[in-house]
Amino acid sequence: IAENIREVYRYYKQQGWNYQQYIACMDPLYEEHGLNPYSLTSDMYGKFLSELFECWYKDYRRGKQPYIRQFENYIGILLGLPPESCEQQGRCGIQYVVEADGSAYPCDFYMLDEYCLGNFNEHTIDYMDEQRKKIHFQEVSMRFSKECKSCPYIQLCRNGCQRNRVEQADGTYKNYFCDAYRF
């Protein structure tokens, strides 16, 4: 999709799909970013975002743009509104992703045994909230690198999704797609 976003955008519009959300392709958790044949590089993602924005903005000027969550959040941020997307809040929100068996996780990108907060058939929400605190899920998402804190783009980027961050030597995190947001 990243290499053909103009065609994808046109196709989605032809289908009447006016609500769109694009999530960057992620490498497996705990693996170094960019080593798989399908890996999305920061450069590719930056070009993707630029081309998608050009398509969207052209339609916006005609009053016929689809709702694209990321762009709508950017506009809201520029207008002083809080973004609803956790990726653009700069920290993980409090939410529960629940499997059919009742198992609950803090995020759909962290549905692994080590992140299981409990099970709705066996535990209370208070118990699951305590588990979330024990694994420091939200606290870790708020560790920005010094470079990020002083970056002129931090108000828009906010270091992105925790899942796309790379740990720095000082224990803070920097978004793998940082350069893409500066495109």
Locate each region found by the language model:
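Generic marker of residues within folded, mature protein domains
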Residues: 86-88, 92, 141, 168
